[in-house]
Amino acid sequence: GRPARAQVLVDASDPIIAASALSNTQGIAYAQSLPILYGRLRPETSYEVSTLPVDLEVRGWYNPDLVTSFYIVPGLIGVLLTMTMMMITSMAIVKERERGTLEQLLTTPIQPMELMIGKMVPYAAVGFMQVTIALVVGIMIFKIPIRGSLLALYGMSFFFIVCYLSLGLLISTLTRTQQQAMQLSFFIFLPTILLSGFMFPRAGMPLPAQILGLLMPLTYFMEVLRGILLKGVSITLLWRWIIPMIGLMFLFMALSVIRFRKQTD
């Protein structure tokens, strides 16, 4: 006559999916309990039921209170880096081309690769400053937990920053004016926000949208950020997200170098 007890553990790092999973789990428990309760009832007796036959204990991991900011704020770090690194790099190079200063730099003994690295280093420093400021604001205002290694977080941020700096350089080789560079940057940025899992869970997207999302570095960086900050996951368990992100970084670097050398030649 004692209730059957069961425990359900839910990954609550995404509060939207976790809330849906908790609701569905409770619904299953009630659906299993009702036939048993009806079978116990007798016409000549009436009593109050204090405990369901299926006693379900649900526990949410990583974000038990389902705080939405714990999920949103880490993603904002990636969104901020995506927008700024890609846009400021592409527009800065195009601006120098419009002014004619880029051609003056190319007449010096500096190699095109050295020029590209020189352009990327200051913006990479800006990117690390943005990560630091976002972390400080997230901790002080939104009480975001940091359960993993900050060193690993900054290391993965380096690859992500270089990835979008390279994409910004590639955009600068495909455009002639600052307006064109800004428009192309926004053309890439908006689908990235929608398909990376920042606004909507990727599991609920159509298959073509999920495939397109895999072509965007932000998709992988989102998982890395939330894995390190919310779950305390080590790098060894994040390789399925890290390797594609690094692969896209090298792809964008190679394409930007090829295009840049063609233009300088």
Locations of the language-model features?
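Transport-system extracytoplasmic interface segments
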Residues: G1-T84
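Hydrophobic transmembrane alpha-helices
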Residues: L76-M83, A124, S157-V162, L184-S196, ...
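Hydrophobic alpha-helical transmembrane segments of multi-pass membrane transport proteins
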Residues: R59-M140, C163
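Short cytosolic juxtamembrane segments of multi-pass membrane proteins
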Residues: I258-D265
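Alpha-helical transmembrane segments and their short interhelical loops
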Residues: P112-S185, L190, I235-I242, I246, ...
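Short helix-capping/hinge motifs at transmembrane helix termini and TM-loop junctions
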Residues: S90, V94-K95, T108, I141-I146, ...
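Membrane-interfacial helix-loop-helix junctions in multi-pass membrane proteins
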Residues: Y62-L66, P145, G197-L251, R261
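Transmembrane alpha-helix boundary and packing residues in multipass membrane permease domains
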Residues: M87-M91, L135, I139, L169, ...
